[in-house]
């Protein structure tokens, strides 16, 4: 479901304008770096404000893509990076659809945000992504319930590049202190769990160039 995004690279994030806030963020970055699980802080656009070394290690092998790198905007990465499924297991239902739900909610709250609008335009330019957003997302939410759209507490599959881990479940935990929340930020951590799955190869569907393959989540029209 990922595709090559055609939008422009997001503009640099504004730096908080008080010394106190900047000092807090610098100290919080030290705290974040001390965590062993991949962690990141994002704003309402999913622009990555900061991320720790474990997060960078998880996605270090991603080939360069101008508008959809995990350390720039995590929403764009999940939706648009052609290799996101190499790390994010069960990519469509585990990651893409929940993130589409978050985009939809963000647009309802921040409808005039230029970056969110740009992401929505990039979705509209791709027939598969547009079908997922308009048809697949409501169908999926109806099938699994609103709770499945929440990230906090969700268990997701990672295909960890460390061969000692391989396919590994993680629990996404949102833990945002008040000072970050006041800035419009949220912190998410991927708590790696002990490997409870057989280390079988995890296959993901590949999309042929120029072929509008049918998304599994989009209901098939009846004849």
Sequence positions of predicted segments:
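Hydrophobic protein-protein interaction segments
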Residues: 19-42, 48-219
